[in-house]
Amino acid sequence: MARINQLVRKPRRARAKKSDVPALEGCPQRRGVCTRVYTTTPKKPNSALRKVARVRITNGAEVTAYIGGEGHNLQEHSVVLIRGGRVKDLPGVRYHIVRGSLDTAGVSGRRRGRSKYGEKKPKE
C-alpha cells in the first residue's frame, strides 16, 4: 500500500480502456471498399445466413462488417461507410455498414426505424 506522501508526489494512473473498434482509430465512421461480400452462419443456438462483407478501410485495415436490413445491393468494389457495433452471434464481426450512404442503398419499403436503414419517409 502506498503512503499518502507517495500518492501526493505521483498519483495513481487509471488504466487505459481498450477500444472495442480499433480499426476506426477514434473516428465515428470510416470509408472503405468491399473486398468480398458473402453470407455466414451464426454460432449456437441461432441459425441463419447472415450477410457480411470484408472491407478494406482507408487507413489500410481489413475488417468484417455486418450488412443489416432485408436485402442489399453490395458487391465487390462497392464503397461503403463503416460504423462500430458488434454482432453478438457472429464471432469476429465488430463493425456495421451504414445503410443509405455512399454505394449502399437503404432498405426499400421500410416503414419503422427508417433512420437506421437509410430509408426516406414514404409519401402519404
Curated annotation (Swiss-Prot):
InterPro entries: NA-bd_OB-fold, Ribosomal_uS12, Ribosomal_uS12_bac
Entry-linked CDD domains: Ribosomal_S12
The UniProt record lists the keyword Transferase: no
GO cellular component, one term: small ribosomal subunit
Molecular functions (GO terms): rRNA binding; structural constituent of ribosome; tRNA binding
One GO term (biological process): translation
Pfam families the UniProt entry points to: Ribosom_S12_S23
Disordered: annotated span: 1-25, 103-124
Keywords assigned: Ribonucleoprotein, Ribosomal protein, RNA-binding, rRNA-binding, tRNA-binding
PROSITE patterns membership: RIBOSOMAL_S12
Quaternary organization: Part of the 30S ribosomal subunit. Contacts proteins S8 and S17. May interact with IF1 in the 30S initiation complex.
Family listed: Belongs to the universal ribosomal protein uS12 family.
Function: With S4 and S5 plays an important role in translational accuracy.
Protein name (Swiss-Prot/TrEMBL): Small ribosomal subunit protein uS12
Gene name of this polypeptide: rpsL
